[in-house]
Each structure stands twice: as C-alpha cells, then as structure tokens.
A protein has these predicted regions:
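Short, Lys/Arg-enriched charge-dense amphipathic segments
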Residues: 12-22, 58-64, 139-143
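Functionally constrained cores in energy, signaling, and assembly domains
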Residues: 18, 54, 101
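C-terminal, charged low-complexity interaction regions
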Residues: 74-152
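Histidine-centered nuclease catalytic patch
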Residues: 1-41
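Short, surface-exposed, charge-dense and proline/glycine-enriched linear segments
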Residues: 19-30, 66-69, 73-74, 146-152
C-alpha cells in the first residue's frame, strides 16, 4: 500500500493515511479504471478522513454505490476518487460484502429473539467503530447497522 497524508501536516506522521493502489499496479490499466489515490493524483479532497462529521456525510445506495448529499464530498467520492468504478465492480463488491455480513448475522441469530439480533448488531457495530476492527468495505456495513439501530 501507499501512504497519503494531509499536505498541511507534511512532517506530522500521525496524520498519514494508508491508501490502496487503486488498480494502478496492473500494466495497461486505463486512467478511468483507477481509483482512490491512483485516480486522485495531486487533487485536493474536501472530505477529511480524520473528521467523523465529514466521513458521516458518505452514504450508500442499495446497489452498493457510494455518494453524498454534500456536492463537494460527492465529487470527491464519485469523481476524484472514482469509488463507483465499474471496471473494478466496486458497487457490486460493497453490496456483496454487506450481503455476506447480513447473512452471517442472520445465521448467528436464527431462531433467537429480536433482542438477540439487536445485541449482535450492537456487538458488530462496537467492533467496527469503537475497537476499530475495520475491514475492506466496512463503511457499508456500518451504515446499514446504523440504520437498523437508528443511529445518525
């Protein structure tokens, strides 16, 4: 993985952020098929990944695509970072990750009460948000759990 950091904190390494290669390792990949830092290049972002209020403006559609009602953040995710890249099937991958997590929770709670289901949602949510056990595409899982737990 590469390292991306806030230009204002160039020598403050605590502000560095790990980023993916964004489909840039393969030879012959078209620029429009790159994502994340590879697609962003030197463009500045409006969204601040260190600011929870900024990140909370990111939303997910049922098909797994990512967007924001904030026009600048939507431009960041859709254009600058190309996070709905069809060449990499990013929306479908997000949707698949969410379906797998829903299935895991349903299997674990099968035959149990609604309270057990809610406790499993709370446990999973705490694992992701408080314990920071973050996994690829976990944003869509967090968003779904928040909708179920009515967290905004």
């Amino acid at each position: 993985d590469e390292i991306e950091h806030d230009k204002k904190a160039t020598l403050e390494f605590k502000w560095m952020l790990g980023v993916c290669y964004g489909n840039s390792i393969e030879k012959g990949v078209k620029p429009e098929d790159t994502t994340c830092d590879a697609h962003k290049g030197n463009a500045e972002l409006t969204i601040n990944p260190f600011d929870e209020l900024s990140v909370r403006k990111i939303k997910y559609k049922a098909d797994g695509s990512i967007y924001s009602d904030d026009a600048d953040i939507n431009k960041d995710v859709a254009e600058t970072l190309n996070l709905n890249c069809q060449a990499l099937s990013l929306p479908q991958t997000r949707k698949n990750v969410l379906m797998a997590e829903k299935n895991r929770i349903m299997r674990k709670c099968k035959g149990k009460s609604q309270d057990a289901f809610m406790r499993e949602l709370e446990r999973t949510y705490a694992s992701l948000t408080q314990e920071r056990n973050l996994t690829p595409y976990c944003g869509i899982i967090i968003s779904w759990i928040e909708s179920k737990l009515k967290i905004s």
